Swiss-Prot record:
Binding, GTP: 38-45, 64-68, 82-85, 149-152, 182-185
Cofactor(s) for this UniProt protein: Mg(2+)
Disulfide linkage: none
Residue ranges of coiled coil: none
Keywords: Cell cycle, Cell division, GTP-binding, Magnesium, Metal-binding, Nucleotide-binding, Septation
Name this protein carries in UniProt: Probable GTP-binding protein EngB
Domain of life of the native organism: Bacteria
HAMAP family: GTPase_EngB (MF_00321)
Annotated organism of origin: Pseudomonas aeruginosa (strain UCBPP-PA14)
Domain EngB-type G: 30-204
Cell cycle as UniProt keyword: yes
UniProt GO molecular function: GTP binding; metal ion binding
């Protein structure tokens, strides 16, 4: 499936565009962009790199190191955005609050934002920060696709049970905007499914492909 997905070839041409500390430093609000968010240490950088087949996000050993919105151009009208890691205990509270203010401003005001990938560690899902992201997405009626990362850390049955449990809660609270799946960067589990979501949000699928995905 991934060989037929146009997002793969496009991501191979991705290039760093700009880093922004706040919304007014972002690129012009036009075209389409998809953002990647996640609590620090939830595997956001690994997921982004695996989905794009590129080393777009530096996988750091120090969670929370990325403090800026990092934009990557796929072509003249499509972008990916690596949002700051959030929630790590060693980050000072004022800095956490600063990140939250600017994340909320970005999510609520960015017209070109087509959707958000939210990374949740399958062993520690639905943290306060995860719920906050879901609330922001719902308030803006913005599609949000949850990747339950590090699924390889659990046995298959346990991972499925965790998915079902979280899915029930997500559907009850944020079902109008949120979808979710299992994901493992090392095992490449769930990569094709997530790439299809990414391609759809960026307007890369034709009508036949979208109908197939919805069937």
């Amino acid at each position: 499936m991934s060989e037929k997905n146009p997002i793969v070839g496009l991501c191979q041409k991705a290039s760093f565009l700009i880093s922004a500390a706040q919304v007014d430093q972002c690129p012009p609000d036009e075209g389409l962009e998809v953002a990647f968010a996640g609590r620090s240490n939830a595997g956001k950088s690994s997921a982004l790199n695996t989905l794009t087949h590129a080393n777009l996000a530096r996988t750091s050993k120090t969670p929370g190191r990325t403090q800026l919105l990092n934009f990557f151009a796929l072509d003249d009208s499509r972008r990916l955005v690596d949002l700051p890691g959030y929630g790590y205990a060693k980050v000072p509270i004022p800095l956490k609050q600063h990140w939250q203010r600017h994340l909320e401003a970005y999510l609520s005001s960015r017209a070109s934002l087509a959707g958000v990938f939210l990374m949740m560690d399958i062993r520690h899902p639905l943290t306060d920060f995860d719920r906050l992201m879901l609330d922001w997405a719902q308030a803006s009626q913005l599609p949000i696709h949850v990747l339950m990362t590090k699924a390889d850390k659990l046995a298959f049955g346990a991972a499925k049970n965790a998915l079902l449990k979280v899915r029930r809660e997500v559907q009850q609270g944020w079902g109008d905007v949120a979808t979710l799946q299992l994901f493992s960067a090392p095992k490449r589990q769930g990569v094709d499914e997530a790439q299809m979501v990414l391609a759809q949000w960026l307007g890369l699928l034709d009508e036949d492909q979208e109908a197939f995905e919805e069937a």
